[in-house]
């Protein structure tokens, strides 16, 4: 797992996930072995792990454009968990 943003700069929000409170990140540009995408990570039991993948796989640059595009245009800027 790789991130385009430093872990300490990622914003997290506590949510109820199936009856358990966990910390889920704002949408971020991240990568797995399959490629780059916009997704979220969570903090659970002291570990950082993938939480969800919101887009298909693409280049790092394309994923950053999707993240920076306003939500009303199909991107993630303005997402409730995203930084204001």
Task: Describe these PLM feature segments.
Residues 45-64:
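A short, exposed loop/beta-hairpin motif centered on an aromatic-Gly-Thr core
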């Amino acid at each position: 797992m790789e991130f385009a943003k430093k872990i300490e700069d990622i914003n997290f929000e506590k949510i109820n996930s199936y009856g358990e409170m966990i910390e889920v990140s704002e949408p971020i540009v991240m990568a797995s072995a399959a490629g780059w995408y916009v997704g979220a990570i969570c903090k659970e039991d002291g570990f950082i792990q993938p939480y969800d993948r919101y887009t298909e796989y693409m280049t790092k640059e394309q994923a950053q454009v999707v993240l920076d595009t306003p939500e009303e245009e199909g991107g993630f800027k303005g997402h409730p968990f995203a930084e204001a």
